[in-house]
Amino acid sequence: MAVSPLFPLQHKTALVTGATSGIGLVTARELARQGARVILVGRNPDKAAQARAAILAAVPDAVLDVRLFDLALLSNVRHMAAEIQGDYSQLDILVNNAGIMPGPLTVTAEGHELSWATNHLSVFALTNLL
């Protein structure tokens, strides 16, 4: 007997950042399993292709869209948000999962500390822009 989900996800669109591994990959896979169209966001093309293949192996009828963006730069976040808004009439679910571990002090081209830019500024900006 199949269990009916509390919130049906068929015909819903979900965007998952950091979707190429770990929690993000599992989240994207399970959203797809529940029938959502999933936009996978990652920064590494090889890992993104592997993530897409892994999800399709588990959920052959998954509807996936892979986007490559490095969220450490707010200019990339703005570009991605505009692209998503142009391509989709509605975004139902946003999973801000992308993050990095702090390492040696690294400053982005926009002048922000790398982990602060990725883990905090991009989340705030993406949520507000979408």
Question: What kind of region is each of these model predictions?
Answer:
Residues V59-V63, E83-N96, P102-V107:
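A glycine-rich helix->loop->beta "capping" turn
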Residues G18-A19, V41-D46, L71:
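N-terminal Rossmann-fold cofactor-binding loop
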Residues T127-N128:
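A short, exposed helix-loop element centered on a Lys and neighboring polar residues
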